[in-house]
C-alpha cells in the first residue's frame, strides 16, 4: 500500500540516505500510478504527504522547497499529513540563517522566501515553527549590523514563541540575543542568557 512506503522514504532522507530515499519515491510514484481504486480524497491525502516529503528531501534550498510546500498545502487543505511529522526542520541548529543561507548576495531573497515558506510549513506540523520567520529576519538584520532592529525582531519572535510554547525556536532566539549582546560587549546580559539556556 502506498501509505506504508511514505514513512520509510521519510526515514531514508532523515538519516541522510538520499539516493535510497529517491528510489523509494520512484516506487511510490509507480504504485500511485497503478492504483486506480483510490478515491480522490485518499489520493490527495497521499500526494499531499508525498509533496511534504519532497520538500523535506530538498532541505535548505528554499527556492525548491517552496513550490512543494504550496502543493502540499493545496492537496492537504486543512488535514494533517498522513504520517507523523515530528520534525520542526531545525535539526538542532542554533541559527536559522546558518541553515538556509546558501549563496552570497541572496540573503534578502532567502529571508523573503523563508517568510513565505515558514507559515505554510509550520501550519502543517501543528504550528511548531511559529515565529521562526521573525528570527530569520532578525538574523538577517544582525549580520548586516542593524543590531537594534534585530533585537526588536527577536522580541517579536519571543512573544510568539512563549505564547505558543515553541521551545524548538526559543533556543535560536536566545542564541541570537547572546550574539547581539556580545557585539555590544554586554557581559551581564550574556551571563543572564547563558543561565537561561542551562
Task: Write out the residue ranges for each language-model feature.
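Short, intrinsically disordered, charge-balanced linker/junction segments flanking boundaries
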Residues: 1, 191-198
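Cytosolic nucleotide-utilizing catalytic cores of signal-transduction proteins
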Residues: 139, 179, 184-188
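Alpha-helix N-cap and coil->helix boundary residues
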Residues: 149, 189-192
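Internal alpha-solenoid helical repeat scaffolds
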Residues: 2-172
